[in-house]
From Swiss-Prot:
A cellular-component GO term for this protein: DNA-directed RNA polymerase complex
Transmembrane segments: none
Function according to Swiss-Prot or TrEMBL: DNA-dependent RNA polymerase catalyzes the transcription of DNA into RNA using the four ribonucleoside triphosphates as substrates.
Entry-linked SUPFAM superfamilies: beta and beta-prime subunits of DNA dependent RNA-polymerase (SSF64484)
GO biological process entries: DNA-templated transcription
Residues annotated as binding Zn(2+): 218, 291, 298, 301
Keywords, ordered alphabetically: DNA-directed RNA polymerase, Metal-binding, Nucleotidyltransferase, Transcription, Transferase, Zinc
Assembly and oligomerization: In cyanobacteria the RNAP catalytic core is composed of 2 alpha, 1 beta, 1 beta', 1 gamma and 1 omega subunit. When a sigma factor is associated with the core the holoenzyme is formed, which can initiate transcription.
Essential cofactor(s): Zn(2+)
GO molecular-function terms, A-Z: DNA binding; DNA-directed RNA polymerase activity; metal ion binding
Pfam name, any one: RNA_pol_Rpb1_4
Protein name: DNA-directed RNA polymerase subunit beta'
EC assignment: 2.7.7.6
Length: 717
């Protein structure tokens, strides 16, 4: 890669390309020329940005047409999972995990689909340009605009298994909006505290790392470096990690054994690429982490100063520069939550799918063990790296080649030896780094509860009884199988019912099971109450007697939306009908009450009954039903509420007063009678005058027997 070759570049320049361009200019043309080039690049950018501004409108947000199919497939998969959960094949945790992984996979697939769709239909779309220029916004935000928002976390940080299937272009439903607002709230709350934290982090870093560069070589042993990988994917290639460092010990070509780079030589971009091309897997380099200089860092361990892509100068405050470099993005990282707001993105294991129709062949030496995945499926866990073969199905005379699948330790195989597979069927998930070792397992007993009541039937389950030393018997299953619960309803038939079905008959819902006969004790007219449509009536009425009231008319009065029925009889009495038309009446029931106002009292007082009996059932508020007639006497009372000092009282308790007597200052009584005084704490509460006649009797003994009895007017006692 000489500098001449690179002068003309015909490609889209995004942030990454720009970075490469500047670093290339630095390496081959030095700082001064690069500064001029950067200036010209800036002018170029501004010139075209102002000539053709990138606008954005709703129509630029194109939703990929395959979205519907992806969502349907995901929903189908979740329905299947739900069925498996209801059948008890998987637990609640496994169901939840499967749902989350399904939606996460769908969301990722949709994101890729969005990119492909933009590339195919309109690579100059403003949304696409913004997302991939690297200047502002990224694909995860575009995914929310035109893909789907995906899974969200609730305030406790738990993932909600209801995904937001819509995007901002289509608009959210009410439920989705509520779920979505959790994340936004989280973003706003966390932001202020984070900004302060990052500034403080920078100060602390500067304080602890005031290292400056002194001396050339401390002669330390070294640190080895290799490409940074995750599973089969290389995240950072070797060349990128080597650039700007100093070699720790001679690098030899793996085949020819010639020295590619000597110890203590700095690694330029060309040398880094040369080392990577030669196939060296690991290079030993110098590092500030292993530097043995007394109070600082030596030149060889530090390597390049990235400001001018050459070895660091003596006395440079490298520690403070490092502290500032770490602290500076801190302020920007605080904005992260603010923009995305709680959208969940998880790691997806790399899926291996079949490229052909064929049969699975697992070699003998491939070490696997049966294992239950976190989704509750039966699978094989690969214990050591190996290869799986797919033998293709013959098409005519042509035998296609076998497909080899490389499996790393910790991968999960979803197919077994001898299984037939179709093209694009999922064969395995190759574990990405970090999740490979699964040593800690724990045994737990999980209960499977039935949602239905019914009779238990075993299908292919062979129960086996074991008795332990304590004499407890447990039943375990010897083979895999299903337990069916035959759900049904139990009916109690009344005595004398005649069955119309036989044992083992199939019946439809609302089918007749048995019939009974009803015999009436009384003769009369049969009447069926009006049945509500769709419901059969359970009652049959037989009218055995009827009463007719002669010369009576019924009038209806309605007040406050209620109808009152009034019955007028021949002798001009008006009754209030208590039994409204259409209600049932029992024998001896009161059906109407007389309306009469001759018995109104003019004053307050006490009621006394003579010979009247009432039924004590029911509430006093509704009145008591009179069982036996008699006399009712209202003894009137005159009450004066006073609430003044006792000194104002002019009569005594129990005194007989004439009408017109002043009982309390400025209060005169209307009737003659006996005074009753109520007082409390020298405050006069109430004065009551009980009217009546005071008679003087010569022989008190003769009248003592008439105490508490009624006396009619003119009666001699």
């Amino acid at each position: 890669m000489t500098n001449e070759k690179m002068i003309f570049r015909n490609r889209v320049v995004d942030k990454g390309q720009l970075r490469n361009l500047i670093s290339w200019a630095f390496t081959y043309y030095g700082t001064a020329r690069t500064a001029v080039m950067a200036d010209k690049l800036k002018d170029l950018g501004f010139r075209y940005a102002t000539k053709a501004g990138v606008s954005i409108s709703v129509d630029d947000l194109m939703v990929p047409p395959t979205k519907r199919l992806l969502l349907e497939a995901a929903e189908e998969e979740i329905r299947a999972t739900e069925t498996r959960y209801q059948r008890g094949e998987i637990t609640e945790v496994e169901r939840f995990q499967k749902v989350i992984d399904t939606w996460n996979g769908t969301s990722e697939a949709l994101k890729d689909e969005v990119v492909v769709h933009f590339k195919k239909t309109n690579p100059l779309s403003s949304v696409y340009m913004m997302a991939f220029s690297g200047a502002r916004g990224n694909i995860s935000q575009v995914r929310q605009l035109v893909g789907m928002r995906g899974l969200m976390a609730d305030p406790q940080g738990e993932i909600i298994d209801l995904p937001i299937k819509t995007n901002f272009r289509e608009g959210l439903t009410v439920t989705e909006y509520i779920i979505s607002s959790y994340g936004a709230r989280k973003g706003l709350v966390v932001q202020p505290s984070r900004t302060a934290d990052s500034g403080y982090l920078t100060r602390r870093l500067v304080d602890v790392s005031q290292v400056y560069y002194s001396g050339f070589d401390c002669g330390t042993p070294e640190l080895s470096i290799r490409p940074m990988t995750e599973g089969a994917k290389t995240l950072i290639p070797l060349a990128t990690r080597l650039m700007g460092r100093v070699i720790g010990e001679d690098v030899l070509h793996p085949v020819t054994k010639e020295v590619i780079a000597a110890r203590n030589s700095p690694i330029s971009e060309d040398l880094a690429k040369k080392i990577e091309k030669s196939g060296v897997g690991e290079v030993v380099v110098r590092s500030p982490l292993t530097c043995e200089a007394a109070r600082s860092v030596c030149q060889h361990c530090y390597g390049w100063s990235l400001a001018h892509a050459s070895m660091v100068d003596l006395g440079e405050a490298v520690g403070i520069i490092a502290a500032q470099s770490i602290g500076e993005p801190g302020t920007q990282l605080t904005m992260r939550t603010f923009h995305t707001g709680g959208v969940f993105t998880g790691e997806v294991a790399q899926q291996v799918r079949s490229k052909i129709d064929g049969t699975v062949k697992l070699p003998r030496k491939l070490k696997t063990r049966t294992y239950r995945t976190r989704h509750g499926e039966d699978a094989l866990y690969v214990e050591a790296n190996g290869i799986m073969l797919l033998e293709p199905t013959k098409v005519g005379d042509v035998t296609p080649e076998n497909q080899e699948v490389h499996l790393t330790q910790g991968s999960t195989l979803y197919v077994f030896d001898g299984n037939k597979v179709n093209k694009v069927q999922l064969l395995a998930e190759v574990a990405l780094g970090g999740r490979t070792t699964r040593t800690n397992t724990e045994k737990a007993v999980k209960d499977v509860a039935s949602d239905l009541a019914g009779e238990v039937q075993f299908a292919e389950v062979v129960p086996e009884q074991k008795t332990d030393r304590q004499g407890n018997t447990t039943t375990t299953r010897r083979t895999r199988g299903l337990i069916w619960i035959l759900s049904g309803e139990v009916y109690n038939l009344p005595p004398g019912a005649e069955l119309v079905v036989k044992n083992g008959d199939a019946i439809a819902s609302n089918g007749v099971l048995a019939e009974t006969k009803l015999a009436s004790l009384h003769g009369g007219v049969v009447r069926l109450p009006e049945a509500t449509p769709g419901k059969s009536t359970r009652e049959i009425e037989i009218i055995t007697a009827s009463v007719v009231l002669d010369q009576a008319t019924v009038t209806v009065q309605s007040s406050q939306g209620r109808n009152n029925y009034l019955v007028s009889t021949g002798n001009n009495q008006v009754f209030n009908l208590r039994a409204t038309p259409g209600t049932k009446v029992q024998n001896g029931q009161v059906v109407a009450e007389l309306i009469d106002d001759r018995y109104r009292t003019t004053t307050g007082g006490f009621l006394k009954f003579a010979g009247v009996e009432v039924q004590k059932k029911g509430k006093a508020k509704l009145g008591y039903e009179v069982v036996q007639g008699g006399t009712c006497c209202g003894s009137p009372e005159e009450s004066h509420e006073v609430n003044k000092d006792i000194s104002l009282l002019l009569v005594e308790d129990g005194q007989f007063v004439e009408a017109g007597t002043e009982v309390v200052k400025d209060i005169f009584c209307q009737n003659s009678g006996v005074v009753e005084v109520t007082q409390k704490n020298d405050i006069l509460r109430e004065v009551v005058v009980k009217p009546g006649e005071l008679l003087i009797v010569d022989d008190p003994e003769s009248v003592i027997g008439r105490d508490n009895t009624f006396i009619q007017p003119g009666e001699e006692f």
